[in-house]
Amino acid sequence: MAPETPAAAPGQSPVQGHDSPVQGYDPRTGTPAGAPLPAAPAAEVDRAVAAATAAFSGWRAADRAAALDAVADLLDAHTAELAALADRETALGEGRLTGEVARTTGQLRLFAGVLRDGGYRDTVIEHAGQARPDLRRINRPIGPVAVFAASNFPFAFSVAGGDTASALAAGCPVIVKAHEGHPHTSLRTAELVKQALAGAGAPEGVFGLVFGFEAGVRLVRAPGIAGVGFTGSTRGGLALAKLCAERPDPIPFYGELGSVNPVFVLPGAVAERGAELAAGYAGSLTLGSGQFCTNPGLIFVPEDEAFLGEIAEAVAGTVGAPMLAERIHSGLVAGLADLAAVPGVRLLAEGKPGEGPWAPTPAVYAVAAQDFEANAEKLREEHFGPVGLVVTYRPDEAGGPAGLVERGSVGEGHLTSTIQLASEDEADLAAARELLPGLERIAGRIVFNGWPTGVAVTHAQHHGGPFPATTAPAHTSVGAAAIRRWLVPVVYQDAPAGLLPEPLAG
């Protein structure tokens, strides 16, 4: 039996799908949502891979751009239907989900624009010179890609999400392993994607969808698959990475795993806007029931009882909301019991309980910096949910926040890190300068005077970070640069003009 595979995100069961039907649930009630869907048998996975392999040739960039636009247009036209369906399976709210469909279609159109711009090819032409051949380099697609959908974003990181959009843009056929947390949403989204692609004249087999644990294992092991994209838990990601590495022909694995996204609040910021910071923190921490990979799970604040009181007051005003799955909820409850048992840790504040069997109570715990460092490995574990740990420090002791980073207490890899400072305060500016070199080593995005939860889909975005945040810190899963994961450079040396790819023929 294969190693435990994946969960495409926290909440995906490592055992559901062993040739058993995939059943979604309503997180508000814990009852089944829709009929179970059959897991894909081996023959179905093999057919999907064979079709994807056959489709991998000659899909022009202009046609890919038109196809991505067509998918975006059709998903937009079905926004209300999709949001209602996803709300039944995720309880994330139709308003949030409507916005997420728009984010997803915006992503698709962004990559259509990337294709029309052409810069993703990274073409370089060096004409022959004295004792030097004619060399022409261009990026080419790697081949069919397997995408493991995530639980917490049923559109933007799922069937038609960023991994799928960027791979299709690169010219790579995609087979999505659906997340069992929203099976009917996945199925309907896939139907619309296939309809739009067919209408745009895309090659048959360029997109596929499979359900089930065993299907995911077989997909990763399939000889025709050239790369894997994943968003989810560290445990699930490492299991998949192992499968990729153990193939006779190892393939790249791009995994976004766990992150606690440390926030550093400097003294001047507390003096300038303490209540505002407390409210912003509570809002970011509990957004979406804390089920964001960019959730600010670890916050370092000056030793200041008044500010701790403002944080406690802000958190006390929050209300719990259903989590995506029973397993996520029970995992959070168990993790918090472990957290509360660590020496020096105390409960600072709790919000109001949410409604439903999977709705946790938002909570914030506190610990002094010296106790945190004594148990850092345990205390920087990710707790996926509306829960945070406040670490109080003395700015003039042990190097302050920068000392915590330099000693490795904050951890080695995060998607984000945040500095809250008073921009006109010289002491804060000096402390921030001391922090920056360390944060540049451990985080892919550094936020100033904001909160890390939102991740803009832009050309400049980098959503990645050193392990264990991701398995490939040089790459991003959000933004235009995400296409680079699915490309490989090829150099043509002294090639006859008639054999060169069109962009190199000039």
Each language-model region and where it sits:
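Short loop-to-beta-strand entry elements in the cores of soluble alpha/beta enzymes
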Residues: 63, 67, 172-185, 206, ...
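Rossmann-like NAD(P) dinucleotide-binding subdomain of oxidoreductase/dehydrogenase enzymes
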Residues: 120-277, 282-283, 300
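NAD(P)-dependent aldehyde/semialdehyde dehydrogenase
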Residues: 5, 279, 301-415
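N-terminal Rossmann-like NAD(P)+-binding subdomain of aldehyde/semialdehyde dehydrogenases
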Residues: 1-133
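C-terminal core of ALDH-fold dehydrogenases
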Residues: 355-360, 410-500
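Structural signal for hydrophobic packing residues in well-ordered secondary-structure cores
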Residues: 53-56, 60, 72-79, 83-86, ...
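Short, glycine-/Ser/Thr-/acidic-enriched flexible segments
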Residues: 152, 181, 214-215, 225, ...
